[in-house]
Amino acid sequence: MLLFPIIVSIFSLIFAYFLIREVKKAPSGSGKMIEIAQGIREGAVSYLKRQYKAVAQVAVVLFFVLFLALGIKAALGFLIGAIASAASGFIGMMISTQANVKVAEAAKKGLASTLNLAFRGGSVTGFLVAGLGLLSVAGFYF
């Protein structure tokens, strides 16, 4: 019975992969647009590094507290969830910052292509969170 959630989560991750490919294939626009987008991406990466450093320190403490209070299984479950959350957040941020400039370029062609690309870029994070979360929980109990 636990095989079904694992299969669903794998499909979610595969779908996220195809969404990422679609976003990456879209044109990025002019040199100035790309330059601004790179600045936004650098700021986002800097923010995530700082945030993840602080969260990692808290996570290490919580891991040991959970280990002492509830045992290794609960502590490992927390650690797996934290890693899956960090991975989906990082990948989602990278795709979102890539999608920004591509959506701006798509806006030159019309509303339909703009919204289509924006929804694809934004939904990557959702599919990653759902897929990695479900895979982590189901895999943990498999």
What is each model feature region?
Residues M1-F142:
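Hydrophobic packing and interface segments
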